[in-house]
């Protein structure tokens, strides 16, 4: 096992180097400007060039080409819009439907404040927030599944 020599902090040469910020690792290569100005832009440009090259050389079709003369019977939104689409579909009044759609993010904003005084992170020790979360999840799943069905079976999911 080798003996390591500890630095002598009373040495005036070492103190001068430490005052300049050179320390014991003054022989290394600094990150600025070498890495930040030369290596990082090359890596970023290379990544972008690879992505553009792959997109140009091998374009992939996303879905099937649209045919404006053959539209589907019922146009559905993307899957993450199914619950609010179902709200709009089932509520007869348009203004009420839009207000209910606006109530979804407003309700999500109020969930953290339900048990503001309760500082526990364990969901079993926060019964109100856990109940609201589970109820909202069940309602969102119910509305999402119902939006994929025809309008006459959408509220009951074809079960009743």
Curated annotation (Swiss-Prot):
NCBIfam families: cytb6_f_IV. PROSITE patterns: CYTB_CTER. It comes from Spirogyra maxima. The chain crosses the membrane at residues 36-56, 95-115, 131-151. PANTHER family: CYTOCHROME B, CYTOCHROME B_B6 C-TERMINAL REGION PROFILE DOMAIN-CONTAINING PROTEIN. Signal peptide: none annotated. Pfam families: Cytochrom_B_C (PF00032). This is Cytochrome b6-f complex subunit 4. One of its GO terms (cellular component) is chloroplast thylakoid membrane. Its main location: plastid. SUPFAM superfamilies: a domain/subunit of cytochrome bc1 complex (Ubiquinol-cytochrome c reductase). Component of the cytochrome b6-f complex, which mediates electron transfer between photosystem II (PSII) and photosystem I (PSI), cyclic electron flow around PSI, and state transitions. It is found in: Plastid, Chloroplast thylakoid membrane. GO terms for molecular function: electron transporter, transferring electrons within cytochrome b6/f complex of photosystem II activity; electron transporter, transferring electrons within the cyclic electron transport pathway of photosynthesis activity; ubiquinol-cytochrome-c reductase activity. It comes from the Eukaryota. GO terms for biological process: mitochondrial electron transport, ubiquinol to cytochrome c; photosynthetic electron transport chain. The 4 large subunits of the cytochrome b6-f complex are cytochrome b6, subunit IV (17 kDa polypeptide, petD), cytochrome f and the Rieske protein, while the 4 small subunits are petG, petL, petM and petN. The complex functions as a dimer.
